[in-house]
Amino acid sequence: MAELAEILGEELELPRIQPKSADNIITTKEKYTGVSRTGPESLRHFKRTFKRALRRQISTGNYAPDDPRIIPIKEDQRYRSWKSTQSPDTRAVVIYMMDVSGSMGDEQKEIVRIQSFWINAWLRSNYEGIATRYIVHDADAREVDENTFFRTRESGGTMISSAYKLCRDMIAADYPVAEWNIYALHFSDGDNWADDDTQCLAILGEDLLPALNLFGYAQVHSPYGSGRFLDAIKSRLGERKNIVLSEVPDRESILDSIKTLLGKGL
């Protein structure tokens, strides 16, 4: 987990974080600072290693231009070195929402869990003290603990507005906008009761987006769902600056989706 979180950490950051309160979280970032003679294989600096090997072979007369093989030995090995830096940041909360309705098959639910799991792992490894809340929904929404969020397998109809209402109420009760950086991430296959789309978009546009630093919606492809909710968001709210949309066709697309949701420069 730590290794993948470190890899992600080179390309991601919590978007639009702002100083809002005296209660700080700690941001930890890794920065490559130089080259060392020792280190793990995952950080081997191949260019520097082969340069050292070439220089050694030339100086000892073992380099043959007609047979230019460069064979590094232990003393040639060079590794990237890094330094962890910590800086105070303002407090933040991430609210995860996951569709567990019947149109979400086992594969779709697994893709959503994998993606949200790694986002969660990365956030915790880089933002010490960040708060997290978890919502699952089918036709109704409820708050659950982290373990239930990543393990529950429910079914039923879909009413996305139930999750957005609960998220809105959670923010109003516990997270004053003036004091918190608030992020909401919703994972679904985009299937929703037709009459509910209008209510969803109203809650999202009028209540959630004004309170959120960022709203991320990741839609997984499903053979059972209509998948139309992504298009509804694009047409009504796609121009809003604090909304990010991602499609996840399969497991191979998970990393790209994470980069879309939390990539630098947002």
Sequence positions of predicted segments:
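Acidic/polar low-complexity segments with low predicted structural confidence
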Residues: M1-T90
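Acidic, glycine-rich A-domain
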Residues: R44, T49, I73-K74, S81-I95, ...
